[in-house]
Structure formats: C-alpha cells, structure tokens
Amino acid sequence: MEAFLEEAKASSRVLAGISGADKNRILKEMAQALRASTAEILKANALDMEDADRNDLTPALKDRLLLDESRVEGMAVAVEEIAALKEPVGRVLDGWVTEDGLKIEKVSVPIGVIGIIYESRPNVTSDTAALSFKSSNVCVLKGGKEAQHSNEAIAKVLRAVLKKNGLPEALISLIPDASREGVAKLIKMDKYVDLIVPRGGEGLIRYVSENASVPVVKHDKGQCHTYIDEDANVENAIRIAINAKVQRPGVCNAMETLLVDTAIAKEVLPLLKEAFDAAHTELKGCGETQEIIEVAPATEVDFDTEYLANILNIRVVDGVEGAIDHIVRYGSGHSEAIITENITTAEAFLNGIDAAVVYVNASTRFTDGGAFGFGAEVGISTNKLHARGPMGIEGLTTYKFKIYGSGQIR
C-alpha cells in the first residue's frame, strides 16, 4: 500500500505542468473512450451483478451498482461537462497591497492526493477521476468489493487515455485491495494522502471518521425531511413529496420523513396516502397521523432511520416551528425542504434550519453536483469546514498566498 501511494504522490508534480486546455482535451478523450468501451464495461458490470444476486444485496444497492448503456453514456456526458467547467486552479481569489508595499494574491491550488472511498456506485470511479484531473489532483480510488469488476474496467479505460498522452497512470489510482483492511490502511496514510472523502453507508462513514488520521470530508447520513406548511400549494406539495421519496428512494438525498402542518393535516394526509399507496410506499405515522389515515405506527427509532428504501415516516407538527424542532432533533444536516406560498414562513425555515442545502418548493432530490451545475460531484458534505453540500470542482481546491515584494524586510 505504501509504495502504491508513494507513486501516486510522486505523480502529482506532473499535473502542475499541464495546461487547462490540455486537461480539457484529455477529459474529452476519456469521455469518448468510455463510450467506445461500453461493451467491456457492461460485461464487467454483469459479473458484479451476478455476485450481487448471490450475496443477496438489497434492491437499493443493486440499483446503485447496475450499469446499462444509458448509464455509461451518462458517465461519458458527465466527464464532458466537467471538461467544460471553468479552470479551477490558478485563479486569483483576492488581492491587495499592504502598507509595506507587498502585493498579496490569494490563489486557488489543488489539494494534492485525494482518497475516495465508496461502495456500490461504479459511476463514482469516472466522476471523481475526472473531477480530480480537472482540478489537478491525484485521485486514489478505493471502491467496494461489490463493484470491483466494474471499477477496474472503468479505471482501465481512463488510465489508458493518460498513458496515450504520456502521463503517469498513477494520476488515477485504483487500490486493488477492496477489503475493509484496505480502507483501514488508506485512512492512516497521511504522509501520502491529503484528503479522504468517504461515500457510502452510515457504518462506513462512521468508521472512517473515527479512525482516519487523514482529514475527512463526509456526510453522516441523508436524514432528509420535507415540511408541508398550511400555506402550501397542495398539488405542488404532493408532487414534490412523491418525487422526494419515490423517484429513487435508495439515495442519500431522498426524503425519509414527511412533516405536515396540523392546520392542513386532515385535508392533505388522505391525498398523500392515496398518492403514496399508488407508488407502493410503506407508510409509518405518528399518533395524530394514525387518527387521520391508516398507517403503521412510527417509533422514535424510525424517525432517526435512513431507510434508503420506499418507506416513509409521517409526523404532524405545529407549524414551521414544530417542523424546525423536529429537524433539529433528527436531521443530519444534509437537505431539508419546505412547501409553502408564504414568504415569511419560508424565510423562517431557511434561516432556522442548519443544513447543507435548504429548499423552498422543490424536491430534496436536487442535492446533486450535476443538478447544481457542477458537472458531477465527489460527494455531498455535511461538514461545516472547507466544503459543504455537493462537493464539485471548487471543493477540490484550497488556496495559497503569493506575495510579491521589492526588497522589503521586517
């Protein structure tokens, strides 16, 4: 592991000499190479899917793992979108002249070597490799064993493009050890790795956070809520709630708990139940919810659970303050939404919720680097330092100060 990471670290010096135009050209070549290698990538993914069936992976994990022609095309498009982004490094973020006549520039620079630990999403391999290359970082990829064949096939395609352009293949490094022991080694290698971004289940993220000596940017879990206010447009509220839960329930920006203002609960809950029943959603509710519609009881544990499945908690709350109180207690700081036509209430929610992303009249499913216009994302951070929310190109940079003098001493 150490020799592997030492090679990755050494390769980072090459990136300083690559122009933005050359990086963009190479990224476009990577996108075309992914398209040209679709058959090989899908063949590798089929092996992973066979293993998934044998190992009884959950439907949510299988959905994340599965690749088809459209998803490979989506990977290629994401790489092209990353190529089209503004050059993130070498930008002068601020500048001034001191009383001593020193000219100071605050300039964006790459972080260095970024370790990405992820589970069952093969597209993370191409997304994070492209984002890292665009931002002049080396990426060290540690995928889960359930996607090992797919990750190896994708990384092979990208590394071949690097080699063709005379660049070290170590700029995109895939750790061959897909075991938990491999994670344990990687997160201690602060001599070679500058940042760790874990993407996966709550257990993985907690393990990395508690054991890493390398700085970590993470989200704990996607405990997302939608609050339907008494001044909501009911038709919009139902559409948004269905999308937030049902469109793709196995992802971190899917809603897990729906909060409904007591003032409109009797009107809107029967309509919501009809819509969720049609979507085959398993509903659990608080006592007041159970008095209005027929649902299973929701426990305190349920309100603290990230289901990643088509299961939804419902709680009736006393206005926006009741919604905020619930989210403060159970939220994970990921994404929260209010549905209301009342601007004052909306602002109270926006200002009262401490989360990476807070919505008014929109689905939490938009918390995504692509949806934000970032091209793709390395992950979604609930940290408050360095990066927060969908972590795109800018989250992969830091800064340094360049100071120009003319002989000044102190």
UniProtKB/Swiss-Prot annotation:
- Recorded GO MF terms: glutamate-5-semialdehyde dehydrogenase activity; NADP binding
Question: Gene Ontology cellular component?
Answer: cytoplasm
**EC numbers, comma separated:** 1.2.1.41
One Pfam family of this chain? Aldedh
Which reaction is this enzyme known to catalyze? L-glutamate 5-semialdehyde + phosphate + NADP(+) = L-glutamyl 5-phosphate + NADPH + H(+)
| Protein location | Cytoplasm
Q: Where are the transmembrane segments?
A: none
Record has Coiled coil as a keyword = no
Q: Which PROSITE patterns match?
A: PROA
Name the InterPro entries on file: Ald_DH/histidinol_DH (IPR016161), Ald_DH_C (IPR016163), Ald_DH_N (IPR016162), Aldehyde_DH_dom (IPR015590), G-glutamylP_reductase_CS (IPR020593), Glu-5-SA_DH (IPR012134), GPR_dom (IPR000965)
UniProt keywords (A-Z) are: Amino-acid biosynthesis, Cytoplasm, NADP, Oxidoreductase, Proline biosynthesis
Instruction: State the pathway, as annotated in the record.
Output: Amino-acid biosynthesis; L-proline biosynthesis; L-glutamate 5-semialdehyde from L-glutamate: step 2/2
HAMAP family listed in its UniProt record: ProA (MF_00412)
Query: What does the sequence similarity comment in the record state about its family?
Result: Belongs to the gamma-glutamyl phosphate reductase family.
Q: What does this protein do?
A: Catalyzes the NADPH-dependent reduction of L-glutamate 5-phosphate into L-glutamate 5-semialdehyde and phosphate. The product spontaneously undergoes cyclization to form 1-pyrroline-5-carboxylate.
Q: Write down what this protein is called.
A: Gamma-glutamyl phosphate reductase
The major lineage groups are: Bacteria, Pseudomonadati, Campylobacterota, Epsilonproteobacteria, Campylobacterales
- The primary gene name is proA
